[in-house]
Amino acid sequence: MGSTPVRMPKLAVAMSEGTLVEWLVGEGDAVADGQALYVVETDKVEAEVPSSTSGVVHLTGTPGETYPVGAELGWIEAGP
């Protein structure tokens, strides 16, 4: 079993950071591939970000905090 990082996405060419507005899932929740995980806000857009895989999610990012593109906000542990 492995894990997949949950990262701050690059939603626009000029985007260098984004704010984690809220988690749409809880610590330890089972998530499906494509399920909305969290909301990101930039100076131009607010968007839901989907999971890239299924498994159990672990959250490390704090809502209200700003993170650079690529920063790890948590990870998804592959399920059985």
Residue map of PLM features:
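Mobile cofactor-carrier "swinging-arm" domains
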Residues: 1-80
